[in-house]
Each structure stands twice: as C-alpha cells, then as structure tokens.
Amino acid sequence: MKLLLFTALVLVVISLVEVEAENERACIPLEKECTKTPGNCCSGLRCDCYRRFEQGVAKGTQCWCIEKDVTYKGV
C-alpha cells in the first residue's frame, strides 16, 4: 500500500514538473511577434503593439515582445 501511494506521488510530481517546463518553453522570446498570443511573452517582457501604415492607409496591427521598462520612439 505504501509503495502504491509513493508511486502515485512520484507520478504526480513528475507530471507537474513536465507541465511547468512545457509552459516555460511556450513563452515568446525578445523581439519575436506576439500578435496572436499577446499574453505569452517570456518573463521580463511585454507585448507591445503598433498600427502599421502604408502610404497613409492602416494595414493592420503588429505586436512584438519587448523589455518591460524600455520605451521606443520613432526616428
């Protein structure tokens, strides 16, 4: 009975560790697009979105994972 409980506990711990590792791998790294998944930027990053214009006509929105405390200004 103790062996069965111990085995079940080990399996639960292993599955939790695998889920956590999978969640960490799923994050979007710095300067990669996050338009479709804005909440998936890696830790320390935020998804910042911009409207794209071509010849004065809006062509959609694009989002990128950038550092949280960094502000970009147009040139």
From Swiss-Prot:
Organism: Lycosa singoriensis (Wolf spider)
Single GO MF descriptor: toxin activity
Propeptide: 22-25
Signal peptide: 1-21
Name by which UniProt lists this protein: U6-lycotoxin-Ls1f
Localization of this protein: Secreted
GO cellular component: extracellular region
UniProt similarity note: Belongs to the neurotoxin 19 (CSTX) family. 06 (U6-Lctx) subfamily.
Post-translational modification as stated in the protein's UniProt record: Contains 4 disulfide bonds.
InterPro entries the record matches: Spider_toxin_CSTX_knottin (IPR019553)
Keywords for the protein's UniProt record, in alphabetical order: Disulfide bond, Secreted, Signal, Toxin
Expression (tissue specificity): Expressed by the venom gland.
Organism domain of life: Eukaryota
